[in-house]
Amino acid sequence: MRLDAASVATTAIDFARQFVDAPLDKQKGGADHTTTTEAGQDTPFATGPGDGNAVHPNDVRQNGYGSCAVLSSLVSIAQQDPGAIRDMIQDNGDGTYTVTFQEPIEIFGMQLGTREVEVTVSGPFEGGAAHPSGDVSAGGQQEVWPAIIEAAYAQQYHAHDPQYSTGVNPADVMERVLGVSAQSEDVGSVDFGTIERQLENGDAVVAWTSSTTDANGNSVFATPEQQAIADSYGVVPGHAYGVREVVRAGETYVDPNTGQEVTAAEDMIVLENPWGSNDAAMTFADYQAVYYQLNSAPTSP
């Protein structure tokens, strides 16, 4: 019997749907990734002063190597849906943590669902891309949820380059954390109102600065004009920032670096640096001049 293309596609999709809800085998590991610590030295979650929630964007403090895409995605997800992060980490009580990612299932370009992938990592986490948040539990334990997820992501999806020297796409991170489809768009094609609606709807949103490489192999902005704009805000090239808010002209916002309330003279965007410092409040026009890609994903179906 000869099947036409539509019949083949339908048969393949029906076959794949059998496995959408079937979890993958648990991916255990971490023995050669980190060293097991005594139970109780770290804790996934702790509520720090002014947090309001044990999972907070200010918990993320990137260290020196290139996991900004992972950590900026976590910044934005923590802002919009802290429960999604809490639900993905299980403390095994022995110094190890099991992180559950949502692996998209696609066939012929159609996403049919997700499978759970469990990845177990062990501490201590002092040397990873994410420092402990600085928040401490009543028992004196350091909060380390960003480092736990970063280590698990590296182990599962970036084992060939655990220090992320080749970078990661924030859209991939969002999909694997949230189990939904993420979007990647040119900054120039996403206007102020669209970002405003995305944030109001609870979407996680991350913006990348543009970059090129100079003769010495350093990441730089492509033009002197871009470099001058970026320098005026302390923004660096080839770096991912979580989008905290957009502010219309005439509205007030809190400057992320001074803590002072400011009235916007023109449309503004506030971006959170996963370093844990050097956030940026930029005019929307300047943001469009030095950023090149916007990644977003809904945090709820």
Where are each of the predicted segments found?
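Accessory/interaction modules and long regulatory regions
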Residues: 2-301
